[in-house]
A protein has these predicted regions:
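Anion-binding and metal-coordination hotspots
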Residues: 1-141
């Protein structure tokens, strides 16, 4: 069987023992080593302390799992949740746009939120583009 038939259009790897699994970087083990292992991304949506929706996905990033999970929620209940709350791992322009298009409030921080709001070293670094000084016309000084 050809690799593209096994992987499909959205993946670039597969495990020989489980063709549906995608290689993902796992957390460090007790020796402090990262591991690249075949795995799945499990997503669970909770409403009022009850599991409302769950899904198993092949995407490595949580960011890519948000829209399919919300679509599954909509398929099950006939509406989108009004206030989907998620951590910064889900924050992306596409996810914010999806929320806006479907009448959902955006309760997801963007990926650099903590660093941009609390990290003094980040704000004091003169070589970061966000810290470049501009004049009144917006030109770099």
């Amino acid at each position: 069987m050809e690799k593209t038939q096994i992987c499909g259009p959205e993946r670039n790897s597969y495990a020989k023992t489980d063709h549906d699994a995608t290689f993902m970087r796992m957390k460090k083990d007790y020796m402090g080593n990262d591991q690249l292992l075949p795995a799945y991304n499990i997503q669970i949506g909770v409403a009022d302390e009850y599991i409302a929706v769950a899904d198993v996905m092949q995407y490595r990033s949580d960011m890519d799992c948000f829209v399919p999970l919300m679509e599954k929620f909509h398929e099950l209940y006939g509406f989108y949740p009004r206030y989907p709350v998620a951590d910064a791992g889900y924050g992306s322009f596409n996810n914010y746009l999806f929320c806006q298009e479907h009448g959902m409030e955006k309760f997801m921080k963007f990926p650099m939120y903590k660093k941009e709001t609390t990290d003094e070293k980040y704000h004091d670094d003169p070589f970061r583009a966000v810290n470049f000084e501009t004049d009144s016309e917006g030109d770099l000084i």
